[in-house]
Amino acid sequence: EYGFTAYILGQDQEEAHKHISLFEQHLNALKHQLPQAQYYAYLSSVYTYKLGLDKKHLMKYASGIFDNIKRAMELDDEDPLVLSMQGNVEFYSPFGSKKKALEYYLKADSIYHQMPNTAELWNVRAVQMTIVQCLAKMNRAEDAKQQCMQFLEEEPDCVIFQNLLSELTNPSNN
């Protein structure tokens, strides 16, 4: 639900509202089964999605985002999911830092690569995608291309990386 909710948020606000509520219900039901750091990281994303639908409550939702990701990092700052969520907060926050975001994403990717059986985890590809996007936003297009090609070596059929590489190679076609 985490990834789909982010996707639907930009497509259909009414449907997104339903998915945010469902995501929050499921997250609360799993509170004691998930590692606590991951629970708080996901809870931070719930507030992010709510903010995406309702900017009038910026302070309330921003507080929920920052308080929960801070709690997650205090609990486990070596969990790659938590690191990637902290990276997202840095990347997307108006006062965030792309440089810090990149550091969190790279650390998460490094940890994922040390773990067994992560090749099929979509979170790994999501982190790698955001590394490329972050480098591009930092005006480091050549680094972004190199990183994208490296990720394509790991996952040659990954359409996301093929598309990103095409965008980076042919920016005038976008």
Q: What does each model-found stretch correspond to?
A:
Residues 1-10, 33-53, 78-94, 122-133:
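Amphipathic alpha-helical repeat scaffolds of TPR domains
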Residues 6-18, 48-62, 92-102, 137-142:
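Short coil/turn connectors between adjacent alpha-helices in alpha-solenoid helical repeat scaffolds
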Residues 118-174:
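Terminal, low-structured helical/coil segments at or just beyond the last alpha-helical repeat
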